[in-house]
UniProtKB/Swiss-Prot annotation:
Species for this entry: Yersinia enterocolitica serotype O:8 / biotype 1B (strain NCTC 13174 / 8081)
UniProt protein name: tRNA uridine(34) hydroxylase
GO biological-process terms attached to the record: tRNA modification
Superkingdom in the source lineage: Bacteria
CDD domains: RHOD_YceA
Length: 350
């Protein structure tokens, strides 16, 4: 019987990836469609991706697929053949290729069956996710962004918005997408006659958000086709002025792709302009925060002197401290509240 999951330690897999010299292509894609047997679909696709040497993160659900992956460059054409043939709905599915890519974005393939391909918290049988807003191409985005009757709404999390966003975009200040949906409806209740343009990283969240806004009585709803990734690619190809400023946060080892040269965020430790996200080197913390090179050297990659000191303790004592903490701290913690508390600095609302 074929092995349908990874059996090698993360440390070994990461070391192998870092030692690789073969070029790889980082790509993301998603598709909403009905899967009758998500488990069988997952197992078949996993087997084929393993043979191709694909790394990354893939979520499969009855409502479709959501993937961020890394493919050996010399097998990219094979990968497309496999993917396009995996289901009729995936034939010629749009692939968002990374802008900045050193081939080190992922080191293991994880493919999971979930209830939803994006956690939305929607519990309403009358909601139709296929009834989505109008797609906007890059040139249309640029036309609409200066329209006073149009609002651009960022459907990403606070830490994503902080390092980059469309000009004058509205932030829906939350830690999760499921929180954002009802918040966006409430925030825009008095703007139902305006054009509402939703956007996100690659399109998956803003597409569902556009359907949710229509479901809640908004009429003129749009979303950026392919999200920020596709917008930036097309704008550069077509020589259009970039209306997205800063960095596009991505959920892999890179943690960001530079779209424009603007640095709009600040180091959470000293306040100097910086937009480099990192996780605290103390495994008992692992807080996601922004750190400039000077503070990275000063605090040795940690978020605070406390974590810096703890990191110097023997491994056994570090483990004992982690085990003794009440409830612990979630790995890759992205909570805005925890960031404010841990860093002891006021975080701006926008």
């Amino acid at each position: 019987m074929p092995v349908l999951h990874n059996r090698i330690s993360n440390e070994e897999l990461k070391a192998r990836m870092l030692a690789e010299t073969e070029p790889r292509t980082t790509v993301s894609f998603y598709k909403y469609f009905i899967l009758e047997d998500a488990k069988a679909f997952r197992d078949n696709l996993y087997s084929q991706f393993v043979k191709l040497g694909v790394f990354g993160r893939v979520y499969v659900a009855k409502e479709g697929i959501n993937a961020q992956i890394s493919v050996p460059a010399n097998r990219y054409d094979e990968f497309k053949v496999v993917l396009f043939a995996a289901h009729p709905a995936l034939d010629q599915v749009r692939l968002n290729v990374a802008h900045e890519d050193d081939g080190k974005s992922f080191w293991v393939l994880r493919m999971k069956v979930r209830e939803r391909i994006v956690a939305d918290g929607i519990d309403d049988d009358s909601f139709d996710p296929s009834n989505v807003g109008h797609y906007l191409k890059a040139d249309q985005v640029n036309q609409m962004i200066d329209d006073p009757d149009t609002l651009f709404v960022d459907m990403r999390n606070h830490y994503e918005y902080e390092v980059g966003h469309f000009e004058n975009a509205i932030e829906v200040p939350s830690d999760t997408f499921r929180e954002q949906l009802p918040m966006a409806v409430d925030m825009l209740q008095h703007d139902k006659e305006k054009n509402i343009v939703m956007y996100c990283t690659g399109g998956i969240r803003c597409e569902k958000a556009s359907a949710y806004m229509l479901h809640n009585g908004f009429k003129n709803v749009f979303h950026v086709e392919g999200g920020i990734i596709e917008y930036a690619r097309k704008a550069k190809e077509q020589g259009l002025p970039l209306k997205f400023i800063g960095k596009n946060f991505v959920f892999d080892e890179r943690m960001g792709e530079r779209i424009s040269e603007d640095v709009i965020a600040h180091c959470h430790q000293c306040g100097t302009p910086s937009d480099t996200h990192t996780n605290c080197k103390n495994d008992g913390c692992h807080l996601l925060f922004i750190q400039c090179p000077a503070c990275a050297a000063k605090f040795e990659g940690c978020c605070s002197p406390i974590c810096q000191e703890e990191l110097k303790l023997p491994q056994e004592e570090q483990r004992a401290r982690r085990a003794g903490r009440e409830n612990g701290i979630k790995i890759f913690n992205k909570s805005k509240g925890l960031l404010q508390t841990t860093m002891h600095i006021p975080m701006p609302d926008k």
